[in-house]
């Protein structure tokens, strides 16, 4: 084979400058022929003897074969060098293309799996027929002082424990309570429960008057709109403006029944409370519409319309009502309390944890392909409403209302005005 140095010496020995094409066509074959002859002369004598005895045609054929072998080896060497340089690039390109395709496939599969689980467990899951009532999770904002359970109290002026005064106070309260029960001919142990029909009639008149004023003056709609506008800043950014679409305050009235007076628990028979059963069969509906801004933070580019209508169709509970003094009620909130609220009497009411509220919740999601009445959404809304109710007025939580002064005052005195008809006014004699 011809080395690189020999080829270079051949090129340097050429005194005339010729083009590359002429060199390949004319000069290169003659030079290869000379090189081959030199190679044959340098071989062994036996090989040289065979070549000299061979004919000229055989020598040419042998030369062509040897030339083709040399060219083939040179081309193979060049191809191997080119392949050794281009193979890592091809492998890296294949690796990049395969990693991109692999990531695309994995991403699509993850989205499909997420959609399958979402549709199966969120949309088509049947709502549970019975849901437990949630319990309050935070510390109560106010509570009753149970001073009667302790045997001593602390005198704030002197800073000493006065046991005798505490015992005298408890004894005086017990005697006063027994005196009230005796003079009202009420026996806590044997007295039968009352129906409260008279109270239902008075309460129904009040509710009816409230409904008439609400519908004629649009007080409820105005109050709700102003409330939503004030709280709109507290809404998350992915929710659009809330619009009221339906409002129904009902047409039936609650029924109070089975009222009984009994001693309050953990009071050592020194405090009374009333237990009243409440039953309301009505349909109170609140409907609203909004949009879920999916393409956050670019608003309004992709929005999902949502329509909700929540109706309360049944409410059953046991109401506990008691009358306490301001000293027995201790506030634990950080809000400032007026001095007037620290005196007087308070009406305290709460509901037992065995209450029952039935809802009829309708939901509609989407613009064209709409999802209607998704059970999971109904469960979430029902749970949050019950949680809101439990954290405010379900035992041990309670609501307190300060009672106004009952002593007659001149500023509160009123007189009914009787309007006479035309017939009565004509019959009235004139002086």
Curated annotation (Swiss-Prot):
It is a single-pass type I membrane protein. This is Maintenance of mitochondrial morphology protein 1. GO terms for molecular function: lipid binding; lipid transfer activity. Residues 412-431 are annotated as: Disordered. Homodimer. Component of the ER-mitochondria encounter structure (ERMES) or MDM complex, composed of MMM1, MDM10, MDM12 and MDM34. A MMM1 homodimer associates with one molecule of MDM12 on each side in a pairwise head-to-tail manner, and the SMP-LTD domains of MMM1 and MDM12 generate a continuous hydrophobic tunnel for phospholipid trafficking. Belongs to the MMM1 family. One of its GO terms (cellular component) is ERMES complex. One of its GO terms (biological process) is mitochondrial genome maintenance. Coiled coil: none annotated. Component of the ERMES/MDM complex, which serves as a molecular tether to connect the endoplasmic reticulum (ER) and mitochondria. Components of this complex are involved in the control of mitochondrial shape and protein biogenesis, and function in nonvesicular lipid trafficking between the ER and mitochondria. The MDM12-MMM1 subcomplex functions in the major beta-barrel assembly pathway that is responsible for biogenesis of all outer membrane beta-barrel proteins, and acts in a late step after the SAM complex. The chain crosses the membrane at residues 104-124. Residues 125-431 are cytoplasmic. InterPro entries: Mmm1 (IPR027537), MMM1_dom (IPR019411), SMP_LBD (IPR031468). The SMP-LTD domain is a barrel-like domain that can bind various types of glycerophospholipids in its interior and mediate their transfer between two adjacent bilayers. Its main location: endoplasmic reticulum. HAMAP family: Mmm1. Keywords: Endoplasmic reticulum, Lipid transport, Lipid-binding, Membrane, Transmembrane, Transmembrane helix, Transport. Residues 192-404 form the SMP-LTD domain. It is found in: Endoplasmic reticulum membrane. The gene is MMM1. The keyword Signal does not apply. It comes from Candida glabrata (strain ATCC 2001 / BCRC 20586 / JCM 3761 / NBRC 0622 / NRRL Y-65 / CBS 138) (Yeast). Residues 1-103 are lumenal.
